Amino acid sequence: LHVRDVLPDLIQCALMHVQFETIHPFLDGNGRIGRLLITFFLMERQRLAQPLLYLSAFIDAHKSDYYDLLQRVRTHGDWGAWLRYFLQGVTETATAAGQQARELHRLREHYRAQLRDKPNALALVDELFVNPYMTIGRAAQVLEKTHPTAKAAITVLEQNRIVRELSGRQ
């Protein structure tokens, strides 16, 4: 895995995943770790700038194929079918991630337009796309304003249905 340029990174990643799942080194969590290794490997190879490719949804949607193809590699050496499955998963997952990113961008721009005349609330919108958890204290910190000003900004976000209070404490 540390030798570059022998095989394309996605192919190496698919091979690595089968090897890890075959070894099955832990009593619990092998599946989660195996899927995380895909993301970490692609980040280490600088194929991902952020850990935004996680194949769990694809694997869950095609679970019987996943287990059947892993087994076929072990019993029949059928790497071709496994590689097609894996690359299809990467393609579908990357396409979905791209769509989600575009939707989030459109949503953020919609909120920004909605709040263009409310500078404090507008400043919090961008922060919400970094971390969607907001408290009045954190809002005051982000805005570098007082707690009453931060609370007023959050109230504007609530009135515009951008955030809602969940804790019962405000």
How would you label these PLM feature ranges?
Residues A123-V125, V130-L143:
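Short acidic, hydrophobic short linear motifs in intrinsically disordered regions
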